[in-house]
Amino acid sequence: INNELKNGFIVQGSQPSKLYGLPKIHKEGIPMRPVLSMIGSAQYQVAKILERLLKLLVNNPLECKDSFEFVNRILNWNIESDREVMVSFDIVNLFTNIPLNETINLCVKLWDNLVEDKTKSLSSKALRELLEFSTKNVPFIFNEEWFMQTDGIAMGSPLAPLMASIFLHNLEQKFNNFNGELPLFYTRYVDDTFLIFKGEDNVSHFLEFVNGLHPNIKFTFEMENTNKLSFLDVLIERIKDKYQTLINRKPHDTGFYSC
């Protein structure tokens, strides 16, 4: 590690991470989304620096960065068949099911393959040790009791979206092993995926395939209804030979944002 990085990793006056829940008010039963607030912890500072360094490892054309990019992609898609069907896939509890050892190995492998002259900033050995420190065996407090996260990556860690992206990109590279008809259109935002299939009969076969790619990862799906499907905050409608989009607001969306 060079001196600049070493100084950045030094943390003084750190505090433990704290777990809290965010209610998913748009879902039945209002389940809680576990979020680990790591701000102020030693792991948070290390994770922030690693996230900045590892961004260059992520270059996945299947991902969209936001709703605007998704809309641009879908509006430029020309319908190829009158049997086309829109489907959205959602991964069940993605972050807590990411296998840490496997994903850390992927990060180190990509670092070895893509980073030239990497010894100037961070060796592969140091990268592995820092990734393990900032994601594995992370102590946290919940309800005034101490716990330790041993697998999965905490929603609240600066590394969570990046490591999820690297892990899922590795799964997506296995799509070439699918012996059926691949989706005509595929794009993903974190754990939400929008797909267009040539016909409805292709959906179940592909869903079965992706659900067999990794024991930790399970996909659920939603089919279009009356030529319409919601994805992110967008409502997509198929009209003649084009797709059109509208802003889609969830039933509990007030339109206000907290400061």
Per-segment meaning from a language model:
Residues 1-76, 84:
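Non-catalytic, regulatory and substrate/membrane-recognition segments associated with hydrolase enzymes
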Residues 4-6, 20-47, 86-89, 95, ...:
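Short, conserved non-catalytic motifs in the polymerase core
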Residues 16-19, 86, 228, 244:
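A residue-level signal for beta-strand positions that form part of recognition/binding surfaces
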Residues 24, 37, 195, 234-238, ...:
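Hydrophobic side chains in beta-strands
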Residues 30-34, 44-46, 58, 96-99, ...:
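Short helix/loop capping segments that flank catalytic or ligand/cofactor-binding pockets
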